[in-house]
UniProtKB/Swiss-Prot annotation:
Ribonucleoprotein among keywords: no
Subunit structure: Heterotrimer of A, B and C subunits.
Top-level taxon in the UniProt lineage: Bacteria
Gene of this entry: gatA
Enzyme class: ligase
Organism, scientific name: Streptococcus pyogenes serotype M12 (strain MGAS2096)
One GO biological process term: translation
GO cellular component, one term: glutamyl-tRNA(Gln) amidotransferase complex
The name this protein goes by in its record: Glutamyl-tRNA(Gln) amidotransferase subunit A
The keyword Ligase appears for this protein: yes
Length: 488
């Protein structure tokens, strides 16, 4: 018997009542992973021995009835440090790297007796939108194995969508949680920048990166955020704001809530069928008592260009540490120090990572800094101001998560610009440091469509309130792919 259809609260009740043990739940989860892994390829590492050892220790001391997450398995994206468990960032550069410390988000999960079951596949160093740039494997969409799962947190999304695990962690720099959540029909949240500590997250774009949760439902997503969110002295960008309970508004009605619908989010490049689906969702919010009105975010159209200058510039700096000296891959054909650096980085990084390092280095160079990096920062400020103006009058912003549904494997990986444009609607949220969620909102051609809700900083509770209200009157989150046990 599989437990992957049980909610976290249902699993907790079974564990407290001793109808199952943490060890049994872990064993069943490992079986679910193994039985589906060949089809979807969600994991780089499955930490079976460590997970069973941890489960046995939890059983020995007993399940804490007041701790919802006690004994619950968790999958973790492979750019989040896990002590003693390979953390590769899906790169040849770190193919053998075992951290000697846990990321704060992982330490918080361990503190709640969660069980790290394995590390999920991703785009190399989180650079990509399809999980095809991984050094190890290509992950496949849970609904259609000929399609991409999205990225860069593709493995974390498919692990939940396919029923391998109930909960997982990802990271989001320009849409890397929300886009794969949309493509796989699960709930994915990018928290406000600083809400979850970045300590232990392998850095890509330091002013953009944020760790966040995946789950099948809105409430379970909020329950996992309760675990991982914390202020942290080890992260200088950690926010001092701490919400006591992110589930506190779930179940409340949304009558009187004011929701903005940017006209740019239904503009050029958006699939007409996606437009229909999202407009229907807007009508549903109106039926629930909210007001939905059209607004403008005029500078959002520059988001992709701004993002790829800023993110690539930050990446070119952050990735300088990978040089073959301290840890990870080192080229064995080097005759001197210069060759160690050049050969290691040439052989250790994949094409997309090298592309972004070169773009970032160019943008930061003395002759082009003002024209590119400085200008991108100025336009970023305009994007932030656009959001501020809207949130002066509205509680939330609504729109599609992605311009289209999941695309085919190997169709865009040789067209970087087309791949980058898949994040057109998610990138501005990262540039502004705002919270955003993707929830299931329907299907187009048999593939899931994600609805994105964006809030002002630290408005996760309100986002969850609105998302849960929509979820309560729809059944999209209940529909499951065949690999999970559904009929689609």
């Amino acid at each position: 018997m599989s437990f992957n259809h049980k909610t976290i609260e249902e699993l907790h009740d079974l564990l407290v009542a001793k109808e199952i043990s943490a060890t049994e739940l872990t064993q069943k989860t490992l079986e679910d992973i193994k039985s589906r892994e060949e089809a979807v390829g969600s994991f780089i590492t499955v930490s079976e021995e460590a997970a069973l050892k941890q489960a046995a220790a939890i059983d020995a001391k007993g399940i804490d009835a007041d701790n919802l997450m006690s004994g619950i398995p968790l999958a973790v994206k492979d750019n989040i440090s896990t002590k003693g468990i390979l953390t590769t960032a899906a790169s040849k550069m770190l193919y053998n790297y075992e951290p000697i410390f846990d990321a704060t988000s992982v330490a918080n999960a361990y503190a709640k007796d969660m069980i790290v079951i394995g590390k999920t596949n991703m785009d190399e160093f989180a650079m990509g939108g399809s999980t095809e740039t991984s050094y190890f494997k290509k992950t496949k969409n849970a609904w259609d194995h000929t399609k991409v799962p999205g990225g860069s947190s593709g493995g974390s999304a498919t692990a939940v969508a396919s029923g391998q695990v109930r909960l997982s962690l990802g990271s989001d720099t320009g849409g890397s949680i929300r886009q794969p959540a949309a493509f796989n029909g699960v709930v994915g949240l990018k928290p406000t920048y600083g809400t979850v500590s970045r300590y232990g997250l392998i850095a890509f774009g330091s002013s953009l990166d944020q760790i966040g949760p995946f789950a099948p439902t809105v409430k379970e997503n909020a329950q996992l955020l309760n675990v991982i969110a914390s202020s942290d002295v080890k992260d200088a960008t950690s926010a001092p704001v701490r919400i006591a309970d992110y589930t506190s508004k779930i179940g409340r009605d949304i009558k009187g809530m004011k929701i903005a619908f940017p006209k740019e989010y239904l503009g050029e490049g958006i699939d007409p069928k996606i437009k229909e689906t999202v407009l229907a969702a807007a009508k549903q919010f109106e039926a629930l008592g909210a007001t939905v009105e059209e607004v403008s975010l005029p500078h959002s159209k520059y988001g992709v260009a701004v993002y790829y200058i800023i993110a690539s510039s930050e990446a070119s700096s952050n990735l300088q540490r990978f040089d073959g000296i301290r840890y990870g891959f080192r080229a064995d054909d080097a005759k001197n120090l210069d060759e160690i650096y050049v050969n290691t980085r040439s052989q250790g990084f994949g094409d997309e990572v090298k592309r972004r390092i070169m773009l970032g280095t160019f943008s930061l160079s003395s002759g082009y800094y003002d024209a590119y990096f400085k200008k991108a920062g100025q336009v970023r400020t305009l994007i932030i101001e656009d959001f501020d103006k809207v949130f002066a009058d509205y509680d939330l912003i609504l729109g599609p998560t992605t311009p289209a549904v999941a695309f085919g494997l190997d169709t865009l990986n040789h067209d970087p610009v087309a791949m980058y444009l898949a994040d057109l609607l998610t990138i501005p949220v990262n540039l502004a440091g705002l919270p955003g969620i993707s929830i299931p909102a329907g299907f187009v051609d048999g593939l899931p469509v994600g609805l994105q809700l964006i809030g002002p900083k630290y408005a996760e509770e309100t986002i969850y309130q609105a998302a849960a209200a929509f979820e309560a009157v729809t059944d999209y989150h209940k529909q499951q792919p065949i690999i999970f046990g559904g009929d689609k």
